[in-house]
From Swiss-Prot:
InterPro entries hit by this protein: DEAD/DEAH_box_helicase_dom (IPR011545), Helicase_ATP-bd (IPR014001), P-loop_NTPase (IPR027417), Reverse_gyrase (IPR005736), Topo_IA_2 (IPR003601), Topo_IA_cen (IPR013497), Topo_IA_cen_sub1 (IPR013824), Topo_IA_cen_sub3 (IPR013826)
Domain Topo IA-type catalytic: 677-1054
SUPFAM superfamilies per the UniProt record, alphabetical: P-loop containing nucleoside triphosphate hydrolases (SSF52540), Prokaryotic type I DNA topoisomerase (SSF56712)
Gene expressing this chain: rgy
Organism, scientific name: Archaeoglobus fulgidus (strain ATCC 49558 / DSM 4304 / JCM 9628 / NBRC 100126 / VC-16)
Outcome following mutation: residue 809 to F: Loss of topoisomerase activity
Protein residues bound to Mg(2+): 512, 631
Cofactor(s) annotated in UniProt: Zn(2+); Mg(2+)
The organism's taxonomic lineage, starting at the top: Archaea, Methanobacteriati, Methanobacteriota, Archaeoglobi, Archaeoglobales
Listed name of the protein: Reverse gyrase
HAMAP family, A to Z: Reverse_gyrase
Binding site for Zn(2+) 2: 584, 587, 598, 601
Annotated region described as Topoisomerase I, given as residue ranges: 502-1054
Length: 1054
């Protein structure tokens, strides 16, 4: 491995953590494992106990055990069949034998009886007696046993009761060290039960302060919820550092079929071909009754309505084959069924949807009015009110009443008709069809869902919206019913056998930012949340993993300043020394020295990444498998490498690479895990060391010369500063121009009135290929030129768009368009699509939208709650719009232009002007890549002109300087913005009227550096260094040789 030292980051002794220790997973000073936690000794004992009682524990059960043994409360996120109940009972018995009190709560008496029998069997297998150890209570036990139970209640080490007993007798129960709740929904139905659980754990409610006080004596383990949690459940997060989450998992393996026919004959045909296990969803209760009456004589079928629920049990027992109900989001058949063996397929008779009519306008919620405003934003009156729509709700209502009968907004995923708008209800469809495909310990059962709809316009809109959820419908003609039925049965056979022992394993998934962590967790359901030492962790079950998603908050270490040669031990091996990053929360200063207060402002309000490293270690130790999903570049690779080293001994560490934050991309990345690429890491190590060495050495020279410790020098920023200075000097030279406004002409002339002769020399039509999609430098240039954003602002906005899943990764020099990108473009462009790959194939891709959604679509779908994003402002939508238009234009047919070339004669001079006078085509409409001007009249004219003295050349804009950096090979996509921002930050340049002007300080610093250290900061040397970095990335150059050359060069600076 790459030699490295992490200063004071050994988890065992607190001293340095070195390469050999990382490789061996051992602290050499203490001779102990790097990932040994206090609970591990008890864990070993518990695992042996569990083997005796139950059998070999699953990986996820070991993770739960570690949490409980260190007294952490949590919601157990896991699919059916993993063994939550058996674990809860075995852990209770284990802790009871250690003298701890445990309470196990079930929703029904039957489950209490079963649990009591099971735990006795466990005790028997473990060879321990249960007399006076276990007490259980339910409504069916004789009165004398009940009395005996109540008398000995506080003496039992394990108490097993129903939720109802908790409600009535919690004061007699006493305190507990471990509470296991088998069905948290039963607890949450009565909110006071939450208070009672907290009391049992050692908290109490202070009437004076009106708040909960105390500390948890024990820990709580609950299942995830299926119903609404209610406000009381928030107390779990406040007091026990976890949030329950939902067991509604959106991982699905469903074959979705759309049929433009909702006749009874079509429905009957599906039921006949697929056999038993169908759920039929009707729009309304009346329609459900009609379907039932039509089918009851032909099929063994039942119906579930608000008043008829008896057929549900018959279906469970197999006495009937199919159930009919209504497609309502909170309905019994949509949310209340969890029968993986029985339910094989679903049929929706009619698309789930909700309608808004003109008559509804006055009664609509402000949120719904706002949503309709975004849908009808093409109406000028509404567009004008959108920026402050909340303050004009009543006015918008009146406008909507006028336009809903006339206007037809362009939205493929919504049906707009005269006087009504129909929104497809995908949420209900996903929940209902999800009953056919359930996650269990052995994987995911397969299901099928048929969507029958007569209204072709509504069906088309439904299919369009489904794409936003990665649901692709096929037609019924494409379905092989025999094969489908066999696959449905085979997956249920696997469920019944449950042969795969440990198919679903816990995994820690680390990304850079909290936004990205939240976004990823939302793709797969409503996560349970755990707060561990300040780190927020989102827990979600998937087909192969129970993922714990959390953020590293960028780099966790940086080069130290006070050891070796500016943070590098030079002993022939060049070993970088890294320390945790400290950041002052008050002034923002970042440092690596081991100190409690900020060296700049003295504040003790300092964030130390050490706490995150420790939390990640604990999580990695729990999961025993780590996936690092940091950004797909050298910086992301370096973060992954550091985490792999710092989490040494806690489990295998793999890298997930994805270029967009979408559900599809995350799933693909998790299927294609790889090792950390050390060549990319070496390149980053060399780049950072080079930046440190040249920066520190030359900065110290500047400090001495200018007596200003705020100054800095860098190899890349210095030539860029030189270009800005040179261009500024050139801009001082002036020239006279005559502006003829009537003809939109600018001529090199100094007369205010003169004769002008214009001749048409040539006229031609051309087909122009659209510009390629954005790379980092072209995006930065256009955002500065068109939107007037600084490069720093653009990169920040692009980062947030990427993390929210709206665009692909924004640090790239590739124009390549992937197959996915081309599919997105084809879907949006239709017949205008031609498709271009642009760049060479490879890992990186251009900057593009992740869905075929315009800016207006994105804003509307955010309002509707279909897209869940955070903190977007008008700037985000403006940049997204630019990226979207440029990308879609790049995939269009060539556009046609008409070019006219003119000869212009005036006062004995001749000038030529070629101008585009017309442009047409979809590509031009999307992105105006050419400047269209009016045709010039031909003939001789007496004209008046405005004479101005202007610079021969103008100072650079940020847009132009970025393009120049790209052309001259200075900087990389990840550093363009940093280089420019640093020039502003050091006050070497300022911006006036959008142009970069060097300050006197900037000019003096540049001249000093060029005069004394030209060879170190020259453009050629900087470009050569960039090419060497690229060679290291490709594995063509030894990074130690590069460091050796750099070191010799730096040491020659006097």
């Amino acid at each position: 491995m790459i030699p490295v030292v992490y200063s004071n980051l050994c988890p065992v002794c607190g001293g340095d953590l070195e390469s050999k220790e990382i490789e061996k997973h051992v602290c050499f000073r203490k001779k102990r494992s790097l990932c040994l936690f206090p609970e591990d000794f008890l864990l070993k004992e518990f695992v042996e106990f569990f083997r005796k009682c139950v059998g070999e524990p699953r990986a996820i059960q070991k993770m739960w055990a570690k949490r409980i043994l260190r007294k952490e409360s949590f919601a157990a996120t896991a699919p059916t069949g993993v063994g939550k109940t058996s674990f809860g009972l075995a852990m209770s018995l284990f802790l009871a034998l250690k003298g701890k009190r445990c309470y196990v709560i079930f929703p029904t008496s039957l489950l209490v009886i079963q649990a009591a029998e099971t735990i006795r069997k466990y005790a028997e297998k473990a060879g321990v007696g249960t007399e006076n150890l276990i007490g259980y209570y339910h409504g069916r036990i004789p009165k004398r046993e009940k009395e005996n139970f109540m008398q000995n209640l506080r003496n039992f080490k394990i108490v097993i009761t129903t939720t109802q007993f908790l409600s009535k007798h919690y004061r007699e129960l006493g305190h507990f060290d471990f509470i296991f709740v088998d069905d948290v929904d039963a607890i949450l139905k009565a909110s006071k039960n939450v208070d009672k659980l907290l009391h049992l754990l050692g908290f109490h409610y202070d009437l004076k302060t009106k708040s909960w006080v105390g500390e948890a004596r024990g820990c709580l383990m609950v299942s995830t919820a299926t119903a609404k949690k209610g406000k009381k459940a928030e107390l779990f997060r406040q007091l026990l550092n976890f949030d329950i989450g939902s067991s509604r998992i959106t991982v699905r393996n469903v074959e979705d079929v759309a049929v433009n026919d909702e006749s009874i004959s079509t429905l009957s045909s599906i039921l006949e071909k697929l056999g038993t296990g169908g759920i039929i969803y009707a729009r309304t209760g009346e329609e459900a009754e009609e379907i039932y009456e039509s089918l009851k004589n032909k099929f063994r079928i039942g119906i579930v309505t608000a008043t008829k629920k008896g057929d549900y049990e018959k279906f469970v027992e197999g006495e009937i084959d199919h159930l009919i109900g209504t497609a309502h989001y909170y309905g019994t058949l949509v949310r209340g069924l969890d029968l993986p063996e029985r339910i094989r397929f679903a049929v929706f008779v009619g698309c789930p949807s909700f309608r808004v009519t003109i008559e509804d306008i006055d009664s609509l919620s402000p949120q719904m009015v706002k949503l309709l405003a975004y849908l009808y934003r093409n109406v000028d009156e509404i567009e004008r009110l959108l920026p402050a729509v909340e303050r004009h709700i009543d006015e918008v209502r009146e406008i909507l009443k006028k336009v809903m009968g006339k206007e037809r907004p362009q939205a493929k995923d919504v049906v707009v008709r005269e006087g009504e708008v129909i929104f497809p209800d995908l949420r209900t469809y996903i929940q209902g069809s999800g009953r056919t495909s359930r996650l269990f310990a052995g994987g995911l059962t397969k299901g099928a869902s048929f969507l029958l709809e007569d209204d072709s316009e509504l069906l088309s809109a439904f299919i369009e919206r489904a794409k936003l959820y990665d649901i692709e419908f096929k037609s019924i003609d494409e379905v092989d019913f025999e094969k489908l039925s066999r696959e449905l049965d085979e997956s249920r056979d696997r469920y019944r056998r449950r042969q795969e022992f440990d198919l679903i394993k816990p995994a820690l998934f680390i990304v850079e930012s909290p936004t990205k962590a939240r976004q990823i967790s939302r793709f797969f359901g409503k996560p349970s949340v755990k707060v561990l030492d300040g780190a927020v962790v989102y827990e979600i079950p998937m087909q192969k993993y129970v993922l714990m998603v959390t953020a590293s908050i960028g780099h966790v270490v940086d080069l130290i300043t006070n050891r070796g040669f500016h943070g590098v031990l030079v002993n022939g091996r060049f070993v970088p020394v890294y320390a945790s990053i400290k950041r002052c929360r008050d002034c923002g200063y970042q440092f690596t020295e081991d100190r409690e207060s900020c060296p700049k402002c003295g504040s003790e309000n300092v964030d130390n990444s050490r706490s995150r490293i420790e939390a990640l270690r604990k999580l990695a130790h729990d999961a025993e498998f780590v996936i690092v999903g940091t950004d797909p570049d050298t910086e992301g690779e370096k973060i992954a490498w550091d985490l792999k080293n710092l989490l040494s001994g806690c489990g295998a560490v793999k890298r997930a690479e994805f270029h967009e934050v979408t559900r599809r991309a995350i799933l693909e990345a998790l299927e294609s895990l790889r090792d950390v690429d050390e060549n990319l890491v070496k390149a980053q190590v060399v780049r950072r060391i080079e930046d440190r060495w040249i920066g520190f050495v030359l900065s110290q020279k500047l400090w001495e010369r200018f007596n200003n410790r705020n100054l800095s020098a860098g190899r890349a920023q210095t030539p860029v500063l030189g270009w800005i200075i040179d261009r500024f000097q050139e801009s001082r030279e002036r020239r006279k121009i005559a502006i003829v406004r009537d003809f939109d002409l600018v001529l090199e002339h100094d007369e205010e009135e003169f004769d002008l002769t214009i001749k048409l020399v040539e006229e031609r039509e051309e087909l122009r290929t659209p510009l390629p999609p954005y790379t980092t430098e072209t995006m930065l240039s256009d955002a500065n030129r068109i939107l007037k954003f600084s490069v720093k602002q653009t990169m920040q906005i692009a980062q947030e768009l990427f993390e929210n899943g709206l665009i692909t990764y924004h640090r790239t020099d590739s124009t390549r368009v992937s197959d996915v990108g081309q599919r997105i473009a084809k879907e949006y462009l239709g017949d205008d699509f031609v498709g271009r790959e642009w760049g060479e194939s490879g890992a990186h891709e251009c900057i593009r939208p992740t869905r075929p959604l315009t800016r207006d679509d994105v804003q509307r779908l955010i309002q509707e709650g279909v897209l869940v994003v955070e903190g977007l402002r008008w700037e985000h939508f403006a940049l997204y719009d630019l990226i979207f238009r440029r990308f879609m234009a790049s995939q269009c047919r060539p556009f046609k232009v008409v070019v006219k070339k003119y000869s212009i004669e005036f006062d004995g001079k001749t000038a030529e002007e070629e101008r585009i006078v017309r442009a047409e085509g979809r590509a031009y409409e999307l992105y105006r890549a050419v400047w269209v001007k009016n045709e010039l009249p031909t003939g001789t004219f007496r004209v008046k002109a405005e004479v101005k003295s202007v610079p021969k050349v103008l100072p650079f804009t940020q847009s132009e300087i970025i393009q120049m950096m790209k052309e001259r090979g200075i900087g990389r996509p990840s550093t363009y913005a940093t280089i420019v921002d640093r020039l502003f930050m050091r006050n070497y340049v300022v911006e006036k009227y959008g142009r970069m002007i060097p300050t006197k300080l900037g000019i003096d610093v540049f001249r000093f550096l060029v005069r004394r250290y030209a060879k170190f900061v020259s453009e050629d040397r900087t470009r050569d260094l960039e090419s060497r970095m690229d060679a290291i990335e490709r594995g063509e150059l030894d990074y130690l040789k590069a460091l050796e050359d750099l070191y010799a060069e730096i040491k020659s600076i006097d």
